[in-house]
């Protein structure tokens, strides 16, 4: 479940300046980290004794090594992050249940120092519903769209020219339920994503077993129900995260029954037509107690799909048929840790970084660009309760 209730109210953001260490990379004794071919890696976490907010590391694309993570911005449970198209601003949900005395989570805005990785807090706005779990910045960089798991709702928060957040411009409350009396008594919007044309928003609602489809207007910051307004998945599946393929396909990972459903996406009308549903576990293996899926992403090449399995503690790899959109199982690769809630694929498509929430580690896996298979690199860093990985191209001063 995404929503971890906090009774604390976030009223201020304390930002810790980041001095990225001029240390040798893990596993690369005596070898300095490159400053010309590296990415800033931002790590969203659940805060507590081991974590205080958003952390930053650097990934050297040549050596595969990560620097020791440093606190970049102190804020409450930034469990999902989104980067502005300019790469100059970062936005984080605060997965809390009370903001400024109301039943709401919040969204925090930061300015990125592209050289040091330091985050400067800009401002916060309410997510309108409690327990936000996911957010995305629209392709024009004018709005943040947020999904509230605890409240079962979605909202739009406009972005000003200076990167600050304006008061929410749209809010839609989902309604209904599904078959699981523990998890699906009401709506639980778990993610929201936009199509490449910035015209349609897709909200996966675990509580309803639906992917709701909205027409999105970036100029107005508005959401309007599409026709048809949703795609249905199997009862009790629990749709969680959603990934869009450039060829007109889309994929939702279903948390509760550990499957991925592939859709054909009508790029003009926004509608979704189911193509296939396939298990995220090895062939013949069933769902065990404590197992659930989490994240799903398309490889930058469009050739492969990756999904994370918690409990099984693996990344599943599928090959994508470029003509039909159907998936073929390739492998499950252990994440060398416990509970891989989130992961990130670097923009070059060379590495997958798995965030193991319960073992407090981020592990670097190499991607074979021909087969999609994953290989451990031996590089791991420690950070408290990591759950989200985002990349920003580093810029030398």
What is each residue range found by the language model?
Residues 36, 50, 75-86, 128-139, ...:
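Beta-rich, blade/repeat-based domains predominating
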Residues 67-73, 120-125, 176-182, 226-232, ...:
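A short beta-strand motif characteristic of beta-propeller blades
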Residues 67-141:
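Blade-loop segments of beta-propeller domains
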Residues 58-64, 110-117, 156-166, 214-223, ...:
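Short loop/turn segments immediately following beta-strands, especially the blade-tip
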Residues 291-357:
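Loop/turn-rich, solvent-exposed surfaces of beta-rich toroidal or solenoidal domains
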